[in-house]
């Protein structure tokens, strides 16, 4: 009996060790990832706390500045389709927030919302942008309207693309009807047991499932797009930084910001099939913000700027032209 028990214990240990080896994935050297995902437009700004922020300043340098902020787990590469379509007329500035893209981990370990706002301010100040249009997708949309609340004098207009809203909106929705369709990575990162191992396991499956879910199985989800998410996540230090960011957001409570004080003209763009942030949130934004307009894209998921770049860029162009004429 003892021999049989010892055999079973040994077999279980071997299975667990084999599973751990199979799931394990080490980091990729930062210099290797950087070499692949930088472009001739890439620049790096070192802040006082040692953080090295990756940003791009592209398009028409004499045009109206438009600053665009990516979403959670994404990078400034998400805005490439708009840069190509809007850059002839507008100056397009994109950046990688801490724990993302080629910015990655920062020495301070501060991945809070306040730190995100400081990065936006640092980059725009570095570029001497006193006033600009500010836009963002998902988490980046939340960064955008929060920045406008803190620096209303700097933000001429807002572009919110499937943007995150005040946390109280989502807390109430989760309690009423838990969302079962969103990318698996976001659900798992909400679990303490997964965060304990997430920095060492291979995130490839999560990258595939997350992209297909967020992009509503759009044909833009190519092998290259999946590898971009995957390799940027594996950049040395980034997975630990992602965990630091999610840990810093645990237990947000029911705080709510008064969006009605935002008087800037606001364009709200949303994919009707968004599995990350419900399309009903677009109506909440419009109800909360007095000078806003909404455009909904049928058959589109969480990233209209990538899924329907021509249509969404044209809607932005129309909005910015109306802004210049004082018609919004």
Sequence positions of predicted segments:
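Alpha/beta-hydrolase fold catalytic core
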Residues: 1-64, 89-90, 129-130, 321-328
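Conserved alpha/beta-hydrolase catalytic His-Asp/Glu region
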Residues: 33, 170-173, 195-261
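Active-site loop/oxyanion-hole signature of alpha/beta-hydrolase fold enzymes
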Residues: 48-50, 56-58, 94-135, 139, ...
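Conserved HGGG/HGGXW glycine-rich cap/lid loop of the alpha/beta-hydrolase fold
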Residues: 58-102
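Flexible "cap/lid" loop of the alpha/beta hydrolase fold
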Residues: 149, 159-195
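Short beta-strand/loop motif that positions the catalytic acidic residue
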Residues: 262, 268-270
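Acidic catalytic loop of the alpha/beta-hydrolase fold
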Residues: 273-277
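Catalytic active-site module of serine/aspartate enzymes centered on a nucleophile-bearing elbow/loop
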Residues: 291-328
């Amino acid at each position: 009996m003892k021999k049989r028990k010892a055999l079973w214990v040994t077999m279980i240990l071997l299975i667990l060790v084999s599973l751990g080896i199979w799931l394990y994935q080490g980091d990729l050297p930062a210099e290797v990832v950087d070499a692949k995902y930088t472009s001739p437009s890439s620049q790096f700004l070192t802040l006082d706390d040692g953080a090295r922020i990756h940003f791009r300043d592209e398009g028409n340098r004499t045009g109206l500045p438009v600053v665009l902020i990516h979403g959670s787990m994404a990078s400034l590469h998400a805005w490439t389709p708009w840069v190509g379509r809007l850059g002839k007329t507008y100056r397009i500035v994109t950046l990688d927030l801490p724990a993302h893209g080629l910015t990655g981990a920062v020495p301070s370990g501060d991945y809070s919302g306040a730190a995100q706002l400081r990065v936006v301010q640092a980059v725009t100040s570095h570029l001497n942008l006193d006033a600009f249009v500010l836009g963002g997708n998902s988490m980046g949309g939340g960064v955008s309207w929060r920045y406008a609340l803190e620096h209303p004098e700097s933000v001429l207009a807002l572009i919110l693309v499937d943007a995150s809203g005040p946390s109280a909106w989502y807390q109430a929705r989760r309690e009423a009807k838990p969302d079962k369709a969103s990318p698996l990575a976001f659900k798992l990162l909400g679990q303490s047991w997964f965060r304990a191992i997430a920095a060492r396991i291979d995130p490839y499956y999560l990258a595939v499932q997350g992209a297909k879910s967020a992009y509503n199985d759009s044909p833009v989800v190519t092998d290259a797009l999946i590898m971009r998410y995957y390799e940027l996540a594996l950049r040395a230090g980034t997975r630990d930084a992602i965990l630091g960011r999610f840990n810093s957001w645990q237990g947000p409570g029911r705080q709510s910001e008064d969006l009605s004080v935002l008087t800037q003209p606001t364009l709200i763009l949303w994919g009707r099939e968004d599995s990350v942030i419900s399309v009903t949130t677009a109506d909440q934004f419009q109800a909360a913000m007095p000078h806003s307009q909404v455009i909904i894209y049928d058959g589109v998921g969480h990233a209209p700027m990538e899924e329907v770049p021509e249509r969404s860029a044209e809607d932005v162009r129309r909005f910015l032209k109306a802004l210049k004429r004082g018609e919004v």
